[in-house]
Amino acid sequence: MGRLFPLTMLLLACAAGGCLSSDAPTPKSWMVESSVQGEDTAPQVEGGGTAFGTTRVGSVSVDAPYDKPPFVVRRADGTVAFDHYNVFAANPSSLLRVPVRNRLVSDSRFNCVVQQSSVASVDSQVEVQVTDLSLDCRTAGRRVARAAVTLDVVKTGRGPRGVAFEGTGTGEADASDGNYTRAFSEAVDTAVGGALKALKSVEHAPAAK
């Protein structure tokens, strides 16, 4: 019994000092916000009018493995890791909707961008596909937030719905200062702006007779 006393005291001391604590660090939650640097990226519309009339943001889809809150970290050995201590404040598909909408508002080709819940009739709907939303740590000493986005403008008037315009853009921002809200906000804003600049008409094959 006497031999167990020192061990018991050692365990109590370790517990008091925190070295046996099982409590994990509290995760830090980060946002993706509308960038203050966002500006009109639209090419001049012929005749000075708008190209898309009234629109709304439709579905926002995020490819795996970027579709969950934990950051996806790209590593130098080609693998990815999931950072459970730096996470997005919500699922990325929900978090990106407002920044994308606000970017469309700043694009002169859209006459009006209504809220998702609006009952207003729209001429088009913008579908969003995110194919990259990662923290790139492949270069020693560097952390870079990356984003890649494809926008499909779907006409919603009479007749069959189809993709009328499509564009893809990428963005990156230095994240070495650890401010991931700023870094991912800038990367996403650049990617969406690039996709808007790249919008091109989608040619559809004529229906078979």
Feature annotation, model-predicted:
Residues V57, V100, V128, V149-L151, ...:
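Buried hydrophobic packing residues in well-ordered domains
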Residues M1-C19:
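Sec-dependent bacterial lipoprotein signal peptides
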Residues R101, V105-R109, L135, L196-H204:
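Sec-exported extracytoplasmic/periplasmic mature domains
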Residues C19-S93, E203-K209:
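A structural "domain/chain start" motif
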Residues T79-V87, G157-K197:
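Short secondary-structure boundary motifs at beta->alpha junctions and helix caps
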Residues N86-D107:
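Structured, soluble extracytoplasmic/luminal domains of envelope-associated proteins
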